[in-house]
């Protein structure tokens, strides 16, 4: 904000600029807490998305910190663009060190909030989805950032032959190819499960589902890997579902995994059984308590965008068009259902929760 004075028929700057402490832009895609710091990735991750400027920021102690943006394109690149930040992660060993994934621009690295470098298809193993295009460097898909327990940074590169890319703790890169997810159109989120399994959301189309990888803690030895993609959902009552969209995944404090789809909420009670031929999902049943002895599946048919678990193991569930639910730890009680009609939320579409 600037102040101007009219002088000799012209407006002349007289004061400013005034810069209130605030988010850099009214943009977000994913939010999550890192200790007392709320990390915000401002973008979008979907086909046909608007080109939102790459936005990364965090809120801590009542103050906003906006990360520095790239001042100019790398030498030799025409119209090099940084758009649509999808995930922002903090180095678990250095709170001043961050990485941000971008829907079509690769991977950004920051130190102390300052832009340090961009990883793209010419200086890293990240791949362009249009390698023969004149602006191939503007089509480097990257999302789903997550650190594992060994300080390796995992990411997802949709619409490429090798979806899973890893920047190891020593700076070396690894690419993990699995036929089940090769060229999947939209892979969006990782879950580093406490058991050591890696679970991933493949959102849509023919390769949608939950992909599970057991790499036995040996990134450099592929021979001992187990992996599977499950699209169809069969519950404990042998009821079958084929969701068009898988949106989110979260581990609760008991190690159970909750999965959000366009057809509702599903549970993986023990992820270590995910590879078994006899594996079934479960749906929480809520007794009607009307003397009929019947029960209904929890949030059946409700499109689930996001899930987070609080310190009491309760489930906060954001939906596509039905507001926000707070569910008890055991799933048997709907504690609250917030909508625009009865709460301060501005929309019944909940994109992310932290």
Could you say what each language-model-derived stretch is?
Residues 1-2, 45-49, 104-108, 160-162, ...:
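Short glycine/acidic-enriched loop and turn motifs that connect beta-strands
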Residues 1-2, 37-41, 95-100, 108, ...:
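Conserved beta-propeller blade signature
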Residues 3-5, 58, 109-110, 166, ...:
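Conserved blade-register residue in beta-propeller folds
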Residues 5-6, 42, 51, 59, ...:
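Structural signature of WD-repeat beta-propellers
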Residues 10-24, 63-83, 115-138, 174-183, ...:
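Surface-exposed loop and turn segments in beta-propeller and other repeat-based domains
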Residues 23-30, 78-89, 103-104, 131-146, ...:
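Signature of short aromatic-glycine-proline-rich micro-motifs recurring in repeat-based ectodomains
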Residues 33-36, 90-95, 147-150, 192-195, ...:
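Residue-level detector of Asp-centered blade-edge/turn motifs that repeat once per structural unit
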Residues 52-62, 164-171, 210-217:
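Beta-propeller blade signature
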């Amino acid at each position: 904000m600037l102040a101007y004075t009219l002088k000799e028929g012209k407006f002349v700057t007289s004061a400013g600029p005034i810069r209130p402490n605030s988010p850099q832009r009214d943009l977000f895609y994913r939010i999550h807490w890192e200790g007392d710091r709320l990390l915000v990735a401002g973008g979008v991750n979907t086909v046909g998305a608007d080109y939102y400027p790459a936005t990364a920021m965090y809120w801590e102690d009542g103050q906003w910190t906006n990360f520095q943006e790239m001042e100019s394109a790398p030498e030799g690149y025409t119209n090099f663009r940084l758009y649509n930040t999808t995930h922002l992660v903090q180095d678990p060993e250095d709170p001043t060190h961050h990485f941000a994934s971008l829907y079509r621009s690769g991977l950004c690295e920051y130190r102390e909030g300052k832009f340090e470098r961009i990883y793209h298809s010419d200086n890293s193993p990240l791949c362009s989805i249009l390698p023969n295009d004149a602006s191939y460097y503007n089509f480097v898909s990257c999302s789903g950032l997550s650190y594992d327990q060994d300080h390796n940074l995992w990411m997802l590169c949709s619409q490429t032959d090798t979806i899973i890319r890893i920047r190891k703790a020593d700076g070396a890169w690894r690419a993990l190819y699995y036929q089940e997810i090769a060229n999947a159109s939209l892979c969006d989120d990782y879950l580093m499960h406490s058991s050591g399994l890696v679970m991933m959301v493949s959102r849509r189309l023919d390769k949608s589902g939950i992909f599970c990888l057991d790499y036995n803690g040996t990134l450099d030895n592929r021979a001992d890997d187990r992996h599977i993609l499950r699209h169809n959902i069969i519950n404990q009552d042998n009821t079958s579902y084929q969701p068009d969209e898988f949106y989110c995944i979260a581990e609760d404090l008991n190690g159970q995994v909750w999965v959000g789809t366009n057809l509702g909420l599903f549970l993986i009670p023990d992820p270590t059984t995910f590879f078994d031929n006899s594996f079934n999902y479960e749906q929480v049943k809520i007794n009607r308590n009307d003397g009929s002895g019947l029960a209904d599946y929890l949030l059946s048919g409700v499109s689930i965008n996001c899930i987070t678990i609080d310190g009491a193991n309760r489930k906060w569930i954001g939906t596509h068009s039905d507001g926000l639910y707070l569910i008890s730890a055991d799933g048997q009680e709907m504690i609250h259902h917030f909508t625009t009609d009865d709460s301060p939320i501005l929309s019944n579409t909940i994109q992310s929760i932290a």
